[in-house]
Amino acid sequence: MASYFALVLNGISMVFSQGLFPLYTIPDHLGPWTPIDLSHLHCPNNLYTDASYCTTEQSITYTELKVGSSVSQKIPGFTCTGVRTESVTYTNFVGYVTTTFKKKHFPPKSRDCREAYERKKAGDPRYEESLAHPYPDNSWLRTVTTTKDSWVIIEPSVVELDIYTSALYSPLFKDGTCSKSRTYSPYCPTNHDFTIWMPESENIRSACNLFSTSRGKLVRNRTSTCGIIDERGLFRSVKGACKISICGRQGIRLVDGTWMSFRYSEYLPVCSPSQLINTHDIKVDELENAIVLDLIRRREECLDTLETILMSGSVSHRRLSHFRKLVPGSGKAYSYINGTLMESDAHYIKVENWSEVIPHKGCLMVGGKCYEPVNDVYFNGIIRDSNNQILIPEMQSSLLREHVDLLKANIVPFRHPMLLRSFTSDTEEDIVEFVNPHLQDTQKLVSDMDLGLSDWKRYLLIGSLAVGGVVAILFIGTCCLRCRAGRNRRTIRSNHRSLSHDVVFHKDKDKVITSWESYKGQTAQ
């Protein structure tokens, strides 16, 4: 099955070079019709082949691209941004601690980014802890600054690898490209001065693991090499081939766009810039696989139909539709006319719209003109009904185009936040928007009173302060009582002194007596 996958992909390479898989194929001209027997029916060869008259064969080992490989290789990676968080604490006299957090950038190193990515990938809690604020230290009546470095990993970040030049392309990079070709642990600077891009795999050359080794036969004539028969038995001519390197490996590009690498000593020109393998068009592997699966399904249906025809000995118009060639090129056309199975040589061309085949009612366009049926029978199962409507079986089952439309509609790539805006110049003090969702918010914290003591010391201090307060209250109260008692004694003494010096008036005479002694003397008289 894998070999047939590769064979079919090689066969439709020319079709892809011209565009998507065709909606339908129809002959642009038909040869004369010839009666054939049922045993002459055969399923079409939907592969590109070439004829050669060379006879000398030599077994060789060659290298080819893996099935589904594309010139535009997707390299999964991640971005790493250096963020330094500072916590500034100040403890005042009574123990209040004020903490302020500040963030700024620093240029990260690839080694540290790789370690942070491995921790995040493994679910190591140390990565999440590194994004948290640093545990702030404090000292009484001092300002303490604590710093903590974080490496913010954002993934996925997918870039494109050019297998011709090994350059990386992405809008993340400065000038859109990164040409560093280091083998181990490479990194690329980005539009942000403090962010670098790194691949998920340390060895970026592993992304060029596009090759597979096969065995085939080198076909030669007496003078030169004619081509190579690959392991699937398909002859590949070297006529029109040119030299081209893929991921540093020298090889040749065949005329149909196939790349091979084998020992070839004859002269070949270097491929021009327009002669690239599959060009630079991005082809989704799922799209190619769906088309290949549909081709294989149709070939199996054709073989089943052929087996049914041979065993039953009967054929119908519907069954003849399975023998139509699905890709442009030379093939056969079949019809069932007047009870006779007919065959004609035909050259098929692609059809992208049904209007190209049926421009108006009753007209089947072949070779630029309306093809005349025989008894309302055309070829390859196409007939005309009584209402002059042309019926094509594949118009009801165009699965190939449905695959294309569905796959294109369902591809939603991840958009790295750096792609949403451009970053040209940033300072260390500015934290860019795409990093903020991964970090804690900067904030200012004020703690409760804390003298930096343990619990028992804190309780001892509180008890000592309480006892000291009681003693102070008692002392102040005692002092107040003593002061009041002393004040009262001084008041009494002053009153006694004032009485001894008071002036006495005699009631009989208006004579002033200046003292008690003089009063006693006067009364004695």
Curated annotation (Swiss-Prot):
GO terms for cellular component: membrane; viral envelope; virion membrane. Residues 18-459 are virion surface. Residues 1-17 form the signal peptide. It is found in: Virion membrane. A lipid is attached at residue 480 (S-palmitoyl cysteine). It comes from the Viruses. Its main location: virion. The chain crosses the membrane at residues 460-480. Glycans are attached at residues 221, 338. InterPro entries: PH_Rhabdo_glycop, Rhabdo_glycop_CD, Rhabdo_glycop_FD. It is a single-pass type I membrane protein. Residues 481-525 are intravirion. The keyword Calcium does not apply. Keywords: Glycoprotein, Lipoprotein, Membrane, Palmitate, Signal, Transmembrane, Transmembrane helix, Viral envelope protein, Virion. Primary surface antigen capable of inducing and reacting with virus-neutralizing antibodies. Almost all human and veterinary vaccines are based on the functional aspects of the G protein. Glycosylated and palmitoylated by host. Glycosylation is crucial for glycoprotein export at the cell surface. It holds the Pfam family Rhabdo_glycop_FD. The keyword Membrane applies. Belongs to the lyssavirus glycoprotein family. Its mutation dramatically attenuates the virus. Attaches the virus to host cellular receptor, inducing endocytosis of the virion. In the endosome, the acidic pH induces conformational changes in the glycoprotein trimer, which trigger fusion between virus and cell membrane. There is convincing in vitro evidence that the muscular form of the nicotinic acetylcholine receptor (nAChR), the neuronal cell adhesion molecule (NCAM), and the p75 neurotrophin receptor (p75NTR) bind glycoprotein and thereby facilitate rabies virus entry into cells. This is Glycoprotein. The lineage of its organism: Viruses, Riboviria, Orthornavirae, Negarnaviricota, Haploviricotina. The gene is G.
